[in-house]
Amino acid sequence: ETGDCEVGDKYEGMVHINDATIYFPDMGEIVPIKDELLKTSESNDFVFCMFGINPDLKKFSFTDEQKEKMLSFGDTALVVLDSEEFIRRVNIAAKNAGYQAEFNSVNYYNPNIDGGNMLFSLGAGMWNIAFWKRDSYIYQQEVRFVFRPGAENVDHIELDIGDISDITAIISAEKALSAIVQNEAPIEDE
């Protein structure tokens, strides 16, 4: 959490329980839980967040809300032109540094409703908690890497992914936010 509610979120990496009870059979006790944040074994993993455009969309443009809020993130944008190669390079660098890495889109949830989807996704790996965020951040349209350092106790990590100028472009944030992206690739029917 950064203290800036547009950038940091105390709910990140935590399981938010709106209204539930936990039964402790050894003590025969039922404990009510109301609006609590529960840490997980993965609450201190590291994430690298980026804005992502759904590749299945034929056309994309930023909403007025995105334009307004995202200009505060900085004046420059790094556009990844080859996402598959970018992901491959980051995964190789993470593996070489001894970290497990996962990449996925962020799912957004209503914090006033206890939904089963988040808990269900944690069954596939507790690290999936990094891909859940309150719906007040949906405008960020994030994709993320989560890096799992294992037992290592560090406050940050740095990865050398090498020169990426062949798969990226640097443009002004204003230009990026006013762009209209058109997908010329044929989209397969399911």
Predicted stretch roles:
Residues 1-190:
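NAD-dependent ADP-ribosyltransferases
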